[in-house]
Regions:
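Intrinsic structural disorder
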Residues: 46, 50-51, 99, 174, ...
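Context-gated lysine
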Residues: 43-46, 84, 217, 226, ...
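Small-residue-rich helix-interface/hinge motifs
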Residues: 36-92
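Non-transmembrane, juxtamembrane loop and terminal tail segments
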Residues: 275, 282-321
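Metalloprotease/metallohydrolase-associated module, dominated by Zn2+-dependent proteases
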Residues: 2-29, 35, 78-251, 260-284, ...
Length: 321
């Protein structure tokens, strides 16, 4: 049985060290991501989250026996997934919600993988496989403009090298704390991305180009986009809380060694995020600009919904191909 943490003769907590590490690190990462969400620091990470978002759309097409012709991630944090096939009607019901719910799934899977070092390495390599598939489509996909290929190429290569490199080294060296810190950061990133994106696109406002709006149209006039968004958001939050609870319960069985230095990444990242946010606030105040946490209805600047709605309309026109 795992023993509670203790400091000298005094009992510090009834929890295991792995539970404390998980709670402290995730509790620091989540607000850090939110604080920096609209800053330039998060741009590559948001593009990575967008990459998994588009890959999830592709998974929805493949699951319904359709084919994907291209996957794109743009420099403005937007993306586009083109697909076609003989099961277009069935595909729409899977492809449209796959982006939002896929981001939630990836975030939950990454966080839950931290329960076990081997499982964590497997999930890290699975992420690399997804990135390599996106890289393949960056070269062979039916992209209309050559510059659209470059962001996805750079993104896929960079994150594959970092994630795959650390995961591979962990098979030979005891670098598991580093990989766990990295995976929890990526998991927190996808959790925030999934939650804020669903809320902003579907609940906070109604955009005819959003996935929720197009999905609501599949069910007729009695279904509203905000209702679809509320259902997706509720399901996303429920799954996130459930998986977090599973992870906490699983870590209660662990007997990992106490290493207080492993707790440093979370507080350090949060401290840097606060300082950077304050610094960016001063710069923005000096320039007379204030950037909101969520975009002010400007999803066309990021291209997410426009791309997906174009995808939907394209498949509607194509019919059976």
């Amino acid at each position: 049985m795992p023993t509670p943490l203790a400091w000298g003769p005094f009992s510090v907590t009834p929890f295991t060290f792995d539970q404390v590490y998980f709670l402290v690190t995730l509790a620091c990462y989540l607000p850090a991501v939110v604080l920096l969400w609209r800053s330039w620091v998060m741009k590559p990470f948001k593009q990575w989250a967008a990459c998994l978002h588009e890959f999830s759309h592709a998974l929805g097409a493949w699951v319904t026996c359709n084919s994907v012709t291209s996957i794109e991630v743009h420099g403005d944090e937007g993306g586009l997934t083109r697909w076609k096939g003989n099961n277009v009607e069935c595909g729409r019901h899977a492809v449209l919600p796959a982006g939002y719910m896929g981001s939630c799934f990836w975030g939950c899977l990454i966080v839950f993988s931290c329960c076990d070092p081997i499982f964590m390495q497997v999930v890290a390599l699975l992420l690399c496989v997804a990135l390599l598939i996106c890289l393949l489509y960056a070269f062979i996909g039916q992209t209309e403009e050559a510059p659209d290929r470059l962001p996805l190429i750079i993104l896929s290569l960079s994150f594959t090298i970092v994630i795959g490199g650390v995961a591979t080294v962990c098979f030979f060296l005891p670098w598991h704390p580093l990989l766990e810190a990295l995976m929890l950061w990526l998991g927190a990133l996808n959790i925030v991305y999934a939650t804020l994106d669903i809320y902003d696109d579907t609940v906070a406002r109604t955009d005819e180009r959003s996935d929720a709006y197009q999905y609501a149209k599949l069910w007729g006039p009695c279904c509203f986009a905000k209702c679809v968004g509320a259902i997706w958001l509720t399901a996303s939050v429920f799954v996130l809380l459930t998986v977090t609870g599973w992870t906490w319960t699983w870590l209660a069985r662990s007997e990992g060694e106490v290493n207080w230095h492993a707790l440093l990444p979370g507080p350090i990242v949060l401290s840097l995020a606060v300082l950077l946010r304050i610094g960016l606030g001063f710069v923005g105040a000096g320039a007379g600009e204030e950037k909101p946490l969520l975009p002010d209805g400007g999803k066309d600047k990021r291209g997410f919904d426009e791309a997906k709605a174009t995808d939907f309309l394209r498949s509607k026109v194509m019919g059976n191909v």
